[in-house]
Regions:
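Beta-barrel outer-membrane channel/assembly domains of diderm bacteria
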Residues: 23-136, 398, 407-413, 427-435
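Residue-level signature of outer-membrane beta-barrel architecture
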Residues: 39-40, 45, 53, 91-95, ...
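Residues that define the transmembrane beta-barrel architecture of outer-membrane proteins
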Residues: 43, 79-85, 117-122, 170-174, ...
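Outer membrane beta-barrel
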Residues: 85-198, 222, 417
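Repeated loop/turn-to-beta-strand initiation elements of outer-membrane beta-barrel proteins
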Residues: 96-102, 133-136, 185-191, 224-231, ...
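Detector for outer-membrane/organellar transmembrane beta-barrel domains
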Residues: 96-98, 223-226, 236, 248-382
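Transmembrane beta-strand segments that form the barrel wall of outer-membrane beta-barrel proteins
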Residues: 99-110, 122, 160-161, 193-201, ...
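Outer-membrane beta-barrel "beta-signal"
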Residues: 178, 364-366, 427-442
Length: 442
């Protein structure tokens, strides 16, 4: 039934697009657009967001480790459907020298487990600019450190991105920040010093790390010889001290290179073997990322990144976890003892369940803007490869805006990998999703 629903929606959209193409060309009054832009610029406030509906179909890999963890007490069909509804609001109010910004996210989901609702305040902060070049902010915000597209190893404060959808908004952290900006003539054009205080208490950033500590972060930015450079540091008792560096430079008008480098002091990683014995590795975790973005004359965009995750598991450690799941699953099915499988499920909620828990990855994305002169249509193909075990995910997508403020995205994901590999042990073999997103501005 879900497949039929999605097919009918896509068919309706195609017929709608055909009607649009059949219409005569229309005239655009630029003066009306300019007046609308000016009216928007004169308002001290803004309020907008989007409404979203996203049906999804998941194809279950019943033999995979994460599938057996999720469904060990019940037999799940080979596919299941999920329906997602989302409301995103963001707004601001400005009255010099103060500004207020906020962003909320309300997500309602329905699947075989029933209905679930989650409302979050993504951002809400006050900004004070007493003089030119100085900004003081306090509240919940996203820091956006790092230059990587799919991963940001030098982003020590923000939550990690979803590499399969890295442009999606993230929930921020409660911080107090100060930004001081200076501009110069010569090779050094701009420098910015950012300082951050990150409190971690029971109801403030509680998941950030060890409670009841005030932590400190800082970033120094330079625009030097047309190259963006950042140097970061984070220290405090909630997390171990870490240092970072990133850069970005346009080698030509259509070729950009970027990179990140991060060191995490005294990083501890716990792993488990087939027998359930745990071991803890403590090290100076070194992570780095190198990438490029290339835009052709035909407006085809290529993004390529290599990510070395120093905080990830080795191939043997990931295989040890899978072996432990196998042993726990066998014990449950033969004796009814669910102790081991429940323990494995709890571990899967931590480091083992991260989007990319391994150590070496390649990210590739190619997108084509408006092929065949179809306005507001962008096909794309994304792939993430675990370079250690050879498993990967392939994500084709079609994005189209048939009318103003409406975005339609049809997307699939195909996961490929053998026994014991990262993508071979994910819960799903594939998924198909259709996202309808309507933007509004009040």
């Amino acid at each position: 039934m879900a497949w039929l629903t999605i097919f009918l929606i896509v068919l309706h959209l195609q017929l709608f697009v055909a009607r649009l193409w059949a219409q005569d060309q229309y005239q655009v009054d630029l003066s009306d657009i300019e007046k609308e832009i000016q009216r928007a610029a004169d308002k001290p406030y803004s309020l907008g967001g989007f409404l979203e509906f996203q049906p999804q179909i998941f194809g279950i890999d019943r033999d995979s480790a994460f599938s057996r963890l999720q469904f060990f007490r019940q037999r799940q069909d080979s596919t299941f459907e999920q329906y997602n509804f989302r409301l995103r609001l963001d707004g601001s109010y400005k009255k010099d020298p103060f500004s207020v910004f906020f962003k909320t996210d309300t997500h309602v989901r329905n699947d075989f487990q029933g209905w679930d609702e989650d409302a979050k305040l993504f951002e809400a902060y006050l900004s004070f600019k007493p003089v030119s070049g100085l900004a003081l902010d306090a509240g919940k915000k996203v820091m956006k450190w790092g230059k990587g597209y799919a991963w940001n190893p030098a982003s020590f404060i923000d939550r990690p991105k979803n590499p399969e959808d890295p442009e999606e908004a993230l929930e921020g952290s409660t911080v107090a920040t100060a930004d001081y900006i200076r501009s110069f003539n010569g090779p050094l054009k701009t420098t910015t010093l950012t300082t951050v205080l990150i409190p971690v208490y029971r109801y403030v950033n509680a998941k950030f790390g060890e409670l009841y500590h005030l932590n400190f972060g800082s970033k120094l930015y330079f625009l030097l010889y047309d190259t963006d450079l950042d140097f970061m540091v984070f220290t405090g008792s909630s997390r171990t001290t870490r240092y970072g560096f990133d850069f970005s430079k346009n080698l030509t008008t259509n070729l950009e290179i970027h990179g990140e480098f991060a060191v995490v002091n005294n990083f501890k990683l716990m792993s488990i073997d087939q027998r359930g014995l745990t071991s803890v590795r403590e090290s100076e975790a070194l992570s780095y990322l190198l990438g490029l973005r290339y835009l052709t004359e035909m407006e085809t965009t290529y993004i390529l990144e290599y990510y070395r995750n120093g905080t990830g598991f080795t191939k043997n450690q990931l295989e040890g976890f899978v072996d432990f799941v196998d042993a726990g699953d066998l014990s449950f099915r033969t004796t009814g003892d669910d102790g081991a499988i429940r323990r494995a499920k709890q571990l899967a909620k931590g480091a083992y369940g991260r989007p990319n828990p391994g150590q070496h990855y390649l990210y590739f994305r190619v997108s084509q803007k408006e092929p065949f002169d179809i306005l507001y249509f962008t096909p794309a193909l994304t792939s993430i490869l675990n370079a250690t075990d050879g498993s990967f995910v392939l994500i084709p997508e079609l994005s189209y805006s048939p009318v103003t403020n409406l975005e339609v995205r049809l997307r699939g994901a195909i996961l490929t990998g053998g026994k014991g590999t990262e993508y071979g042990e994910k819960q799903n073999d594939y998924r198909v999703e259709l996202r309808l997103r309507y933007y509004f501005q009040l």
